[in-house]
């Protein structure tokens, strides 16, 4: 018996091929129908043959196994644990666990000179009483190959070796599998669902609105149509973005006085505003309720994409670095999506690149402050049309 196993091992070490034979001496791929296994050399000649029902000196789960199990294990040496386990289930053969299978394959191929499962005295393999504990209910619990394979690998770690047991007593579990995958910082991604829903609704509404427009019509100001939610529900305050540059004509320091009191004051003569944010409220003739605007000179608080949907106007100085942290860095794309304004003093030339942008040029007089009323009235009238195009009523 041991000689048959040793002879088979020598053939496998030499690279000989295994061929299964049935009772009639014909080749077969089904090991359950085979009765013999033959070894073929590289030139195709038969070297040796072995009965598959012969009991070997390999002990698995406390009992000696037939050569059929060893051959089946070898023929599936390149199969995954899941595929091998499924094949054992289909053919009703003893399942050799992953660690046991690895040990046997290494011994049969000659990679190792011993196997802890070889029980015959005097053989090159170790005489060992170590028995790996396998899950006896794997066959009935094969709801999925994946879960059963996981259970098999888990049980392989339960050994009765006193050295291993003693070593495991001194182990400290720093992190388990689930904790490593979960991470240490809990993050709630629920807001992404709301953002996705908002984007989806806006996309659908935009498509419906665009389909009702006459051919060739692009909407107000020839820009890409954007909505800000359902016209029947409550709306969040619209946002006006202004430059943060100290050289800008309008800053958070003087914007409120300019838009509400129609009076321009040089921002250098006014104290700075903390946080770069001011709020103003404005009544419009064609909108039924007062609109409260948030005016900011930066996008640090734009933590969600929906904030950009609320931007109804952008003031620019003509410097492209102003748009570095914007959702759209290109002025051409930015002002196709958002209403743009370029405020400048009368007599100052408008840069050539600004003239190519889709922005409204608004002129201020340097000295005649009584003209500020007309300028502010023009701005609010322009912005009112923008709000109405976005669904404000």
Swiss-Prot record:
Q: List localization entries.
A: Nucleus, Nucleoplasm
| Sorted UniProt keywords | Activator, Nucleus, Phosphoprotein, Transcription, Transcription regulation
Q: Which residues carry this modification: Phosphoserine?
A: 114, 150
A cellular component term (GO) from this record?
Cdc73/Paf1 complex
What InterPro entries does the entry give?
Answer: Cdc73/Parafibromin, CDC73_C, CDC73_C_sf
Biological process GO terms, please?
A: mRNA 3'-end processing; negative regulation of DNA recombination; positive regulation of transcription elongation by RNA polymerase I; positive regulation of transcription elongation by RNA polymerase II; regulation of transcription-coupled nucleotide-excision repair; transcription elongation by RNA polymerase I; transcription elongation by RNA polymerase II
**Is Transcription there in the keyword field?**
yes
Q: Which domain of life is it from?
A: Eukaryota
Residue span of region Disordered? 210-235
- Example GO molecular function term? RNA polymerase II complex binding
Give a Pfam family name: CDC73_C
Q: How does it assemble?
A: Component of the PAF1 complex which consists of at least CDC73, CTR9, LEO1, PAF1 and RTF1. Interacts with FACT subunits POB3 and SPT16.
Q: What does this protein do?
A: The PAF1 complex is a multifunctional complex. Involved in transcription initiation via genetic interactions with TATA-binding proteins. Involved in elongation. It regulates 3'-end formation of snR47 by modulating the recruitment or stable association of NRD1 and NAB3 with RNA polymerase II. Also has a role in transcription-coupled histone modification. Required for activation of RAD6 ubiquitin conjugate and the BRE1 ubiquitin ligase which ubiquitinate 'Lys-126' histone H2B.
Family, according to the entry, reads as follows: Belongs to the CDC73 family.
By what name is this protein known? Cell division control protein 73
Q: What is the lineage of its organism?
A: Eukaryota, Fungi, Dikarya, Ascomycota, Saccharomycotina
